[in-house]
């Protein structure tokens, strides 16, 4: 395991935020019918992967990718709830709990 440095965690946080932004823009694009949002979504994804590439210089790939994906999913669920009124059923909440547990286990491994 590599030695932790805050700059890599900052890059990971930027990657997570950009992934969430990309997902929200993708929803706003309405299947790319609203092209500006589709283009903004693609730009945010490019930025997210660029930031993730910087994060993995100091964070193990398995940990960085799991945290990026996990936090991205959890925050996108929250954004869907707040912005679009989307709600999870009980199975969805069970999935979120398993997701968070998996992220914790990967970080502790």
UniProtKB/Swiss-Prot annotation:
Membrane-spanning parts: 6-26, 36-56, 64-84, 88-108
GO MF entries: amino-acid betaine transmembrane transporter activity; antiporter activity; choline transmembrane transporter activity; spermidine transmembrane transporter activity
GO cellular component, one term: plasma membrane
Keywords: Cell inner membrane, Cell membrane, Membrane, Transmembrane, Transmembrane helix, Transport
Topology relative to the membrane: Multi-pass membrane protein
Single Gene Ontology BP annotation: glycine betaine transport
Intracellular or extracellular location(s): Cell inner membrane
Entry-linked InterPro entries: Small_drug/metabolite_transptr, Small_multidrug_res, Spermidine_export_MdtI
Gene3D superfamilies: 1.10.3730.20
Pfam family, one: Multi_Drug_Res
Family matches, as HAMAP family: MdtI (MF_01597)
PANTHER family, alphabetized: SMR FAMILY PROTON-DEPENDENT DRUG EFFLUX TRANSPORTER SUGE (PTHR30561), SPERMIDINE EXPORT PROTEIN MDTI (PTHR30561:SF6)
Function: Catalyzes the excretion of spermidine.
Summary of subunit composition and partner proteins: Forms a complex with MdtJ.
Family assignment from sequence similarity: Belongs to the drug/metabolite transporter (DMT) superfamily. Small multidrug resistance (SMR) (TC 2.A.7.1) family. MdtI subfamily.
Protein name: Spermidine export protein MdtI
Organism: Klebsiella pneumoniae subsp. pneumoniae (strain ATCC 700721 / MGH 78578)
């Amino acid at each position: 395991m590599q030695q932790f440095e805050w700059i890599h965690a900052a890059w990971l946080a930027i990657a997570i935020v950009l992934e969430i932004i990309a997902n929200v823009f993708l929803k706003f694009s309405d299947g790319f019918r609203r092209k500006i949002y589709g283009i903004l979504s693609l730009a945010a994804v490019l930025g997210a992967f660029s930031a993730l590439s910087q994060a993995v210089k100091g964070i193990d790939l398995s940990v960085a990718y799991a945290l990026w994906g996990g936090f991205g999913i959890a925050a996108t669920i929250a954004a869907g709830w707040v912005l679009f009124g989307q709600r999870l059923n009980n199975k969805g909440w069970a999935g979120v709990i398993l997701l968070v547990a998996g992220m914790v286990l990967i970080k502790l491994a």
